Amino acid sequence: GSKLSFAGEVFCFAEYLLSEKNDRRTVKEANEIDGFYGVRGDIVRFYAASVVAEFIRLFVMPGVPQYVTFSAAVSALKGIEQGDPLLSLAGFLINALDDLGFGMELSYCKACGEEIKERVFFDFPSSAAYCFSCVPAGATEIRFSTFSVLSALASLSVENLKNSDLS
């Protein structure tokens, strides 16, 4: 009924009580936790939030608990709603990929272990950064500023992104 209309809204985060009859599930009760209403009136926030939802839809398997990734998604939606939507999205993707086993090594040179201070190269097959002295064949040079932001995002939890200054 209309008392549950919020449950069908885009980005609704709620606790649902379902009943099942003849292999069909029906929402009997729903308690809204957050509607993330702030993402709806801004196209950039809306698209960033849509990427989070699509990531969850594509990469979190039904019936397989992914508490860390789900919690990161909720925090990212809050960050997208209240903070910088693109930083919140990028931080979510980096953290969620890491949680699902596809993390990137961004804190030091993968080959020599030294801190990267100037030119930086990213190798996509190994998902790692390399310094100029150790760059493997096929690695792509990226801007140091890009590397710095990605490295900072990887070191922060998604919950802390909306309060961060990565400039």
Give the predicted meaning of each segment.
Residues 1-167:
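Non-catalytic alpha-helical scaffolds and adjoining flexible linkers that form interface surfaces
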